Structures are given as C-alpha cells and as structure tokens.
C-alpha cells in the first residue's frame, strides 16, 4: 500500500487493480486521515484517470450492501455536485418527473458535502424515509417507478472518508464516485459532472463498468443539462462514445439565465420543488427539469429530444409528480 501511495505522491497514475486495492483499504478504515487527504489531493491535482475511477468504483460496489436488482430496464440520474452553483435539485426533480413518463429510476444520493442541499437533504425535507429497507425501495421502484437509495445505508465505508472530505472542502475523486456506485447497478445513467474535463473520463469509466447506455454532461459550470450555455455530452451506446453539444433550441426551449436556478436550504428547495412538481413552478425551473428528463428518456430509446421535452412538461403541468412524491413519503 505504501508503494501505491508513494507513486501517487510523485504524480504517477495507478492501474485499475491498484486503485481497487487503495479504495478497498480506504473504506475499511486502514488509511490514516493524513494519508487519505494526500492521496485524494494528489489525484485531484494531476487529474483522475478512467482506470483509477473504475477501480475505486469497483471497490465500493464490491463492499456495498445488496439491493435486489430488477430484471427490467431502469436508470439513475445523478450529479457529482461540487459545481458551486447552489442550484435547485434538478436531478431529483427530474427523476420524479421521468418516473411519470414511464422511465423507472433508482436514484442514488447523499446529504450535502459542498453545496447547500444534496438530494437526500431535500428528500428528508419532503418526509421521505432515507433508511428505507432495500426490499421496500425495490417495491417502490416496481410500483411507483422510482426509489431513492441513501448512499450511507449501502456504503458504510464512506464514513471513514467523510471527515477528510469535509475538511478539504473541495471536490475529490469521492465526488466523482458517488454517481458510479449505485447499489442497484442500473444499466442506464445520466450523470452530470462538475467540470468539463471530467465528461469524457467518466463516460470511459462507465464503459469499463459495463453500462449499456449512458450520457455524461456538463453545461455552463453546472453538473446538469443547461439552458443558459451549451451542454457538453459524452454519450455511451453499445460500447461506443459519441461527443456532442446540446443547446436550449435542441429541446425546443428558450435559453434561461443560470441565476434563475439558484436554490437555498433544504426547506427552501422543498418549497420550490413542491410548487414545480404541482405544476405551479417558475418557467426556468420547469424548463431545466424538462430538458434533463428529455435526455434521460433518450437513453431509454426515445430519441426525439423535443418530443421528450414536451412530454416532460405535460407531466409537470399535470401535477402528478407531486402526488408521486407524497405516495413515496407515505411508505415511510
């Protein structure tokens, strides 16, 4: 282990197997905080490679508590966080809306580390039980088309890294890992990343991890599909990665200012999203969610982004997404 750490300190890259060994030790609490901090910063400064990310993800998935994986097609939609935008929880709202459009979503999330409100902070504010047993979460996925999997419930090893992550107050490989270690192991994923430099490496990592189809996005300094700036996309399909750019017009939408998506505390975000999911939200909010839902639906084989956007907006305006949230909360 010391040889791996020393190699990292010298700015070297490590193999997938070495990364799996390193992160296996991390989640077993075998590294001192100083060693962990130094390793994470060493990788951050020179940039993380896809083999290293895949090795780390494999270590955490191997250690995860089991989830009864369905045999039907389902997805995750999740962002790394750490983009500094403090926006409303677009991916969480998108997951709920997408479920009403026929896309089953098992969303993996956590409490906030570096922003105002993570997905789990928001869900707790809605009264949704974060420690729902795996069998009940699977039942919700079957019957409601959506479930939320709280990372610490399935990845106890995260606790060993959390104090160091909070102390560093910056994005590290752990921010990148969160979207890749969904214990349900979805075959499809829409993943937002906090830096454009991560778009292709994460897509390559998804290919190594065996995803059927996925899209990795970064738009205008946000880990989402953006409407205020071009969105950079790396789409994985049948082992091939295609890079392209999307603009608001591709969704049949008008551009919206980034400031319009500013969020706040979990309670404030809950109120914003409650209005949105009841069909009473702000135009910029529903447009942002609809665009992200549209790209997610594309991964399910619904290729027309404009049609998908229209469908998502109809679902939002119906108010049905809010009823879905309340139904999930009632399963407490």
Swiss-Prot record:
User: Which co-factor is required?
Assistant: Mg(2+)
Q: Where does Mg(2+) 1 bind?
A: 91, 224
Q: How is the cofactor bound?
A: Binds 2 magnesium ions per monomer.
Alphabetized, the UniProt keywords read: Amino-acid biosynthesis, Aromatic amino acid biosynthesis, Glycosyltransferase, Magnesium, Metal-binding, Transferase, Tryptophan biosynthesis
Any one Gene Ontology molecular-function term assigned to this protein's record: magnesium ion binding
One GO BP annotation is: L-tryptophan biosynthetic process
Q: Which residues bind anthranilate 2?
A: 165
Gene3D superfamilies referenced in this protein's UniProt entry, alphabetically: Nucleoside phosphorylase/phosphoribosyltransferase catalytic domain, Transferase, Pyrimidine Nucleoside Phosphorylase, Chain C
Residues at which Mg(2+) 2 binds: 223-224
Catalysed reaction(s) here are: N-(5-phospho-beta-D-ribosyl)anthranilate + diphosphate = 5-phospho-alpha-D-ribose 1-diphosphate + anthranilate
Q: Which InterPro entries match?
A: Anthranilate_Pribosyl_Tfrase (IPR005940), Glycosyl_Trfase_fam3 (IPR000312), Glycosyl_Trfase_fam3_N_dom (IPR017459), Glycosyl_Trfase_fam3_N_dom_sf (IPR036320), Nuc_phospho_transferase (IPR035902)
Domain of life of the native organism: Bacteria
Q: Which GO terms describe its cellular component?
A: cytosol
What positions does the entry give for anthranilate 1 binding?
79, 110
EC supergroup of this enzyme: transferase
Quote the pathway field: Amino-acid biosynthesis; L-tryptophan biosynthesis; L-tryptophan from chorismate: step 2/5
Its biological purpose is as follows: Catalyzes the transfer of the phosphoribosyl group of 5-phosphorylribose-1-pyrophosphate (PRPP) to anthranilate to yield N-(5'-phosphoribosyl)-anthranilate (PRA).
Tell me the protein family, please. Answer: Belongs to the anthranilate phosphoribosyltransferase family.
Assembly and interaction partners? Homodimer.
Q: What is this protein called?
A: Anthranilate phosphoribosyltransferase
In its UniProt entry, the species of origin is given as Sodalis glossinidius (strain morsitans)
């Amino acid at each position: 282990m010391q040889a791996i750490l020393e190699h990292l300190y010298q700015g070297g890259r490590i193999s997938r197997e070495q990364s799996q060994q390193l992160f296996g030790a991390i989640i077993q609490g075998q590294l001192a905080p100083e060693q962990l901090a130094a390793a994470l910063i060493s990788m951050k400064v020179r940039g993380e490679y896809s083999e290293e990310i895949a090795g780390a993800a494999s270590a955490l998935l191997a250690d995860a508590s089991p989830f009864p994986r369905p045999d039907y097609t389902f997805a995750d939609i999740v962002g790394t966080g750490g983009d500094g935008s403090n926006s409303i929880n677009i991916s969480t709202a998108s997951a709920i809306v997408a479920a009403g459009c026929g896309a089953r979503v098992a969303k993996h999330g956590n409490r906030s580390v570096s922003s105002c409100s993570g997905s789990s902070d928001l869900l707790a504010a809605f009264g949704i039980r974060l420690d729902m047993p795996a069998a009940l979460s699977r039942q919700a996925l079957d019957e409601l088309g959506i479930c939320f999997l709280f990372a610490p419930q399935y990845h106890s090893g995260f606790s060993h890294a959390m104090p160091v992550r909070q102390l560093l107050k910056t994005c590290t490989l752990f921010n990148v890992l969160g979207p890749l270690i969904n214990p349900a192991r979805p075959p499809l994923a829409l993943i937002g990343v906090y830096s454009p430099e991560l778009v292709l490496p994460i897509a390559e990592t998804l290919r190594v991890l065996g995803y059927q189809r996925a899209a990795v996005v970064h738009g205008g300094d946000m880990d989402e599909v953006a409407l205020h700036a071009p969105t950079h996309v790396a789409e994985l399909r049948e082992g091939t990665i295609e890079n392209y750019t999307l603009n608001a017009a591709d969704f049949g939408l008008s551009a919206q200012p980034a400031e319009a998506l500013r969020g706040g505390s979990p309670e404030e975000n809950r109120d914003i999203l409650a209005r949105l999911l009841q069909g009473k939200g702000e135009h910029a909010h529903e447009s942002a969610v609809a665009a992200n839902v549209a790209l997610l639906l594309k991964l399910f084989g619904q290729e027309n982004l404009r049609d998908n956007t229209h469908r998502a907006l109809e679902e939002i305006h119906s108010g049905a997404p809010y009823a879905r949230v309340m139904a999930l909360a009632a399963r407490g």
